[in-house]
């Protein structure tokens, strides 16, 4: 076999248009599609052949074409405008972050994720987490937030999906050609490719560093596929979520530990805080602690407190299986030489990744590791925050589940990435000037009402026609490859109708997402879809993990249903779901169907992408829709009820779905005026855009992260670093508290048990607290009350701080009182408790210390 050396020959950009090269190497273009239109003008055919990849295009376009457009006045006018916009964007100091937090402009937020969905040309993502992470970086750039991203570069990317004639998913991995992408190697001081390493048992794993520019944000990716590694180690970063548990622990050591060292030791950055997304990067906590111990010469416990002030953890999963749990022997293999460097024992190390208790054989949980150390923790929707507090309540067994220190920041989308270009033009015309810079404000979206119905509907129909053309191409290719004749294929695709009510369902095919729920009652669905004069089309797309047999069975079943005579040409299953396909779907269907098994959807963002494009949501009240639904902006499936079995839940939800389709959605869609427009439909469509456009953008999401998590931690960690002695004192305070907490006694003073009073009255309650070995300034006493159920559970809890009225210093007894407001009728329960208090205590629940009154 011949071996060839590779030489890349690039056409030379004329000086007049040389900025095409710089902008092509910055993913700013992925949400500024005006730039991409320049390439269409240079050579439309080549642009399509290059799959709309500007870097690849500039390597293949002829020198003649470049010279020609560099003298084209019309082209140059547009080029100059776009170049100016790019320069202004990259160099502007007038950003949201700079204006609101000028004193924090030198801070750095390091954002870690195992996957990033930035653009279809860079397939290093698999699903929701990746798309969210990509959108997170883009909005951080828009808002001027000083953020840097860290991830892994998967040369195989995520798999390409084919669906054969039997409906079976086939997976295909292909190497990404990095030289055709806006990904560039980072250079060291000598101009060579930067290579770092991380320690593995008896060897080093070497990693090449790559960089992607995402507007003003830099994303660094680590790559083990280099000659310095053995063949096995070269595969560490080959596939996303591939391999066995040992491969996963290797990947997560690289992401977390090598990622920290890349930033701090090799790039000379000093991140103020670190943001972990899922438990994949949780090992970064250990590297941070190790570095603090070495730098500050402090104990493990003090270093852990400082690390807590530097870390945010976001959980994106609503189920225990969503967190990696590594066998103890595997953890020992990779960390037995590490925990001595932290100054702790094997048992102390292993317990960092376990819930409290004596069992050391339960496995090392990456989610628990992050929860135990991170100073701030959050879920990704209001409901998911509550689910997460319950899910991880045993990490803080003494704390009421509803008070576990896990908050929430509801996910959003990077609007300009997902907004159809024609809609963007329409919004530019009717919304306020500079709406894109202020999209997180609700008032911006009120102007949607001013868009004439016919103009909005016309754009929607245009998007729908484009989607139908794509469905025809995708289906034709899939069926042709499977041996279907031209006549058979044409019989199916010719039935696609832009006037038909079109419902879309596209997402990862996990079983809890219930992709086949709509077919629960095939006979009823047959009646619904074959109603003369009111046609319906269903379009499905999505991948199942290669190891998920049940998910693949769902795909197969949808294929089989789509080939039933009564559904042929009305149900379509598209293959190779990716960002490009998603853009067509979320802007081209009429209704976005989402029916996960509640409450197992952490957030879900596909419906947010749909709503900003005027596609109306039809969803279970789960994830973001549980807080986004307003009764006038879409439809719901089922209720908030809890069921004894999945079968009962599926039956109830499917019946609700059919009823809403028959009684609300279909009649509303087909109730047209003389211009062929449904006024009621347009009203719901506009309400959908107005109520979700700002609230569910990543612009709003990043504002929330910054205000609620990033800035408080940035300011706290700087205080910690400025006075390590205070941290040591705080650590000693905690140790003393743990030793003496059991001695606290609470006695109720005035007993109102089993009394009856009128609604609207207040009662004054009091208790005596005995503190044998704890200073009274180190605690807070609270009244804890709410409506009490027959089973003794108190709901709708209110917590009121109590006032210190009397002190008996000799006997260490203190008397507290407060008033309880009982505004509405019902049965109430109340009690008292003691909680720790310290100015350096970020979240009281983190200590897992609470003393309740006992008889």
Regions inferred by a protein language model and the residue ranges of each:
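Catalytic cores of carbohydrate-active enzymes across secretory and cytosolic contexts
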Residues: 1-855
């Amino acid at each position: 076999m011949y071996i060839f050396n590779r030489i890349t020959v690039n056409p030379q950009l004329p000086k007049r248009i040389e900025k095409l090269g710089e902008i092509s190497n910055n993913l700013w273009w992925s949400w500024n599609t005006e730039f991409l239109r320049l390439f269409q003008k240079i050579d439309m055919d080549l642009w399509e052949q290059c799959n709309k990849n500007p870097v690849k295009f500039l390597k293949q376009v002829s020198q003649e074409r470049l010279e020609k457009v560099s003298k084209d006045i019309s082209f140059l006018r547009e080029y100059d405008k776009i170049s100016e916009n790019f320069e202004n964007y990259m160099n502007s100091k007038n950003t949201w972050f700079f204006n609101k937090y000028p004193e924090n402009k030198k801070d750095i937020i390091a954002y870690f994720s195992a996957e990033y969905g930035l653009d279809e040309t860079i397939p290093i993502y698999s699903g929701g987490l990746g798309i969210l992470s990509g959108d997170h970086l883009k909005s951080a750039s828009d808002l001027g937030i000083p953020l840097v991203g860290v991830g892994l570069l998967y040369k195989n990317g995520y798999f390409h999906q084919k669906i054969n004639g039997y409906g079976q998913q086939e997976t295909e991995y292909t190497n990404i050609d990095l030289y055709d992408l806006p990904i560039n190697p980072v250079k060291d001081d000598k101009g060579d490719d930067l290579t770092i390493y991380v320690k593995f048992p008896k060897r080093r794993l070497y990693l090449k560093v790559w960089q992607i520019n995402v507007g003003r944000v830099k994303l660094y990716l680590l790559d083990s596929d280099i000659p310095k590694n053995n063949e096995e180690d070269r595969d560490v970063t080959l596939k996303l979520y591939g391999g066995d548990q040992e491969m996963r622990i290797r990947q997560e050591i690289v992401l977390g530990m090598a990622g920290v060292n890349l930033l701090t030791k090799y790039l000379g950055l000093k991140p103020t805080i670190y943001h972990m997304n899922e438990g994949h990067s949780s090992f970064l906590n250990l590297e941070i602690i190790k570095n603090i111990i070495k730098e500050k010469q402090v104990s493990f416990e003090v270093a852990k407190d400082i690390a807590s002030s530097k870390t945010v953890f976001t959980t994106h999963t609503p189920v225990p299986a969503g967190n990696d749990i590594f066998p103890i022997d595997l953890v020992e293999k990779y960390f037995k030489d590490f925990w001595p460097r932290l100054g702790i024992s094997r048992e102390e190390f292993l317990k960092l990744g376990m819930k409290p208790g004596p069992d050391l054989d339960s496995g090392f949980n990456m989610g628990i590791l992050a929860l135990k150390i991170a100073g701030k923790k959050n879920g990704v929707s209001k409901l998911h925050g509550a689910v997460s507090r319950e899910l991880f309540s045993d990490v803080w067994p003494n704390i009421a589940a509803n008070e576990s220190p896990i908050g929430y920041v509801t996910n959003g989308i990077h609007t300009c990435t997902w907004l159809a270009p024609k809609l963007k033009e329409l919004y530019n015309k009717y919304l306020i000037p500079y709406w894109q810079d202020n999209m997180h404000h609700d008032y911006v979206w009120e102007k949607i009402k001013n868009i004439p119905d016919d103009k909005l509907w016309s754009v929607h129909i245009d998007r729908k026609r484009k989607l139908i053309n794509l469905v025809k191409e995708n289906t034709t290719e899939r069926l042709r490859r499977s041996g279907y004749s031209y006549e058979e294929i044409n019989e199916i695709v010719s039935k696609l109708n832009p006037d038909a009510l079109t419902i879309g369902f596209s997402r990862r095919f996990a079983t809890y997402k219930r992709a086949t729920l709509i077919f629960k009652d095939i006979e009823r669905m047959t009646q619904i879809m074959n109603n003369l004069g009111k046609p319906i089309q269903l379009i499905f797309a999505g991948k199942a993990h290669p190891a998920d047999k049940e998910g693949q069975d769902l795909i197969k079943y949808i294929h089989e249903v789509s080939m039933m005579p009564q559904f042929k040409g009305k149900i379509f299953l598209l293959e190779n779901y990716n960002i490009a396909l998603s853009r067509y779907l979320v802007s081209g269907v009429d209704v976005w169907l989402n029916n996960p098994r509640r409450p197992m959807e952490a957030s879900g963002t596909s419906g947010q992408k749909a709503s900003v494009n005027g596609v109306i949501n039809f969803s279970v009240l789960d994830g973001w829709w549980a807080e986004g639904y307003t009764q006038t902006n879409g439809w719901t499936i089922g209720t908030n009820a809890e069921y004894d079995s999945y079968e009962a839940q599926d039956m109830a939800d499917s019946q609700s779905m059919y009823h809403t389709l028959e009684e609300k959605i279909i009649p509303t869609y087909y109730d047209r005026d003389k211009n062929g427009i449904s006024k009621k439909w347009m009203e719901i469509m506009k309400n959908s855009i107005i109520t979700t456009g700002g609230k569910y953008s990543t612009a709003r999401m990043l504002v929330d992260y910054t205000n609620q998590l990033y800035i408080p931690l940035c300011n706290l960690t700087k205080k910690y670093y400025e006075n390590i002695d205070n941290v040591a004192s705080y650590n000693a305070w905690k140790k003393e508290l743990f030793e003496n907490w059991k001695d606290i006694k609470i006695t109720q003073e005035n007993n109102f048990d089993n009394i009856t009073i009128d609604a609207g009255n207040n009662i004054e309650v009091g208790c005596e607290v005995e503190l044998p070995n704890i200073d009274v300034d180190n605690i807070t006493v609270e009244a804890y009350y709410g409506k009490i159920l027959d089973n003794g559970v108190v709901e709708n809890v209110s917590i009121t701080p109590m006032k210190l009225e009397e002190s008996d210093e000799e006997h260490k007894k203190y008397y507290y009182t407060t008033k309880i407001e009982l505004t509405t009728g019902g049965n109430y329960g109340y009690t008292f408790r003691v909680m720790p208090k310290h100015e350096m205590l970020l979240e009281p629940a983190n200590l897992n210390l609470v003393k309740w009154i006992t008889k």
